[in-house]
Amino acid sequence: MQFFKDILNGSDLFDGEWYKETYPDVARLGMDSAEHYLKYGWRMLRDPSTEFSTKFYLKFNSDVKSAGVNPLIHYITQGVNEG
């Protein structure tokens, strides 16, 4: 989990403060923003920032969706190089 949290936190496409402000239930849970997005948020089609649309990415990358892969992690580690 820490490996993937580090990937998110090192990316301009993940904004932990924005995530907590946009989804106040995360703050109420006292959960780390990156951990929430990794475990639950992307499955709830929540966006990790204003710069990345989870729903859009999954819509146009059905292989990622059907594989159950976190869309932002996929984009950062593979998708950005796929074009």
Give residue spans per PLM region:
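Charge-rich, low-complexity intrinsically disordered regions
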Residues: 1-83
